[in-house]
Amino acid sequence: MGQNDLMGTAEDFADQFLRVTKQYLPHVARLCLISTFLEDGIRMWFQWSEQRDYIDTTWNCGYLLASSFVFLNLLGQLTGCVLVLSRNFVQYACFGLFGIIALQTIAYSILWDLKFLMRNLALGGGLLLLLAESRSEGKSMFAGVPTMRESSPKQYMQLGGRVLLVLMFMTLLHFDASFFSIVQNIVGTALMILVAIGFKTKLAALTLVVWLFAINVYFNAFWTIPVYKPMHDFLKYDFFQTMSVIGGLLLVVALGPGGVSMDEKKKEW
């Protein structure tokens, strides 16, 4: 009974949190989700020559192609962010940002770095959830019209988004024998599984948001590193990418897990 009471109290707290924040939580989620694209687009502007020279040196593609790559990244990311925040052409913005992720994965050789690849996939999961949200908003004007068959892609996008989001947490697992690491791995893995299968989803996602935010502020405190040091840019990139995954989790909290989840199946039982 003690465990049931504790779980019930936690779920009541999560429900109360949602009631208080439901008006602005989706907006905060979107801002967090696109923050890494916004930061990267601004960085492309201020580090234009460095980014161009890096691409030119890595791929030996010449000044013109390297400059075109940087310009495409800058324009694509900033335009996508503006469209998402203004809720205009959100689906096109998501597809454009998907393209940016794929382009950067190849250009910066992220494909061969498992940790960064998993984080990019997690970022793609957040965009999938945003795409699912935009589809539901687009259909809201037809409330009352049967759309069971049409809503199916949205449900599977939510499932795919949830599964991809948990990849971020797999990069945070520590494989050492310390007591703290073992406890953190067990709790984190349990929460990841709950989010992926959609069981107690909002509570698990909200708990992961708090946990990931604390880890992010502690380990990626780029503001404590002088701007001229390379570690500053590395931590800043990591910080905002993690914030984007937090945004995806906040969308899960705000919108729920979708139809393909244990929470929804329980209602049918």
Curated annotation (Swiss-Prot):
Motif Di-lysine motif mapped to chain: 266-269
Pfam families: SURF4
Protein's membrane topology: Multi-pass membrane protein
Domain of life: Eukaryota
Keywords: Endoplasmic reticulum, Golgi apparatus, Membrane, Protein transport, Transmembrane, Transmembrane helix, Transport
GO-annotated biological processes: COPII-coated vesicle cargo loading; endoplasmic reticulum to Golgi vesicle-mediated transport; Golgi organization; lipid export from cell; lipid homeostasis; lipoprotein transport; positive regulation of organelle organization; regulation of lipid transport
Keyword Ribonucleoprotein: no
UniProt subcellular location: Endoplasmic reticulum membrane; Endoplasmic reticulum-Golgi intermediate compartment membrane; Golgi apparatus membrane
Chief location category: endoplasmic reticulum
Disulfide bond recorded as keyword: no
Any GO molecular function: cargo receptor activity
Segments crossing the lipid bilayer: 64-84, 92-112, 179-199, 203-223, 239-259
Gene Ontology CC terms: azurophil granule membrane; COPII-coated ER to Golgi transport vesicle; cytosol; endoplasmic reticulum; endoplasmic reticulum exit site; endoplasmic reticulum membrane; endoplasmic reticulum-Golgi intermediate compartment; endoplasmic reticulum-Golgi intermediate compartment membrane
Family under the similarity heading: Belongs to the SURF4 family.
PANTHER family: SURFEIT LOCUS PROTEIN, SURFEIT LOCUS PROTEIN 4
Role this protein plays: Endoplasmic reticulum cargo receptor that mediates the export of lipoproteins by recruiting cargos into COPII vesicles to facilitate their secretion. Acts as a cargo receptor for lipoproteins bearing both APOB and APOA1, thereby regulating lipoprotein delivery and the maintenance of lipid homeostasis. Synergizes with the GTPase SAR1B to mediate transport of circulating lipoproteins. Promotes the secretion of PCSK9. Also mediates the efficient secretion of erythropoietin (EPO).
Domain remark text: The di-lysine motif confers endoplasmic reticulum localization for type I membrane proteins.
Subunit structure: Found in a complex composed at least of SURF4, TMED2 and TMED10. May interact with LMAN1. Interacts with ZFYVE27 and with KIF5A in a ZFYVE27-dependent manner. Interacts with STING1. Interacts with SAR1B. Interacts with TMEM41B.
Name assigned to this protein: Surfeit locus protein 4
Name of the coding gene: SURF4
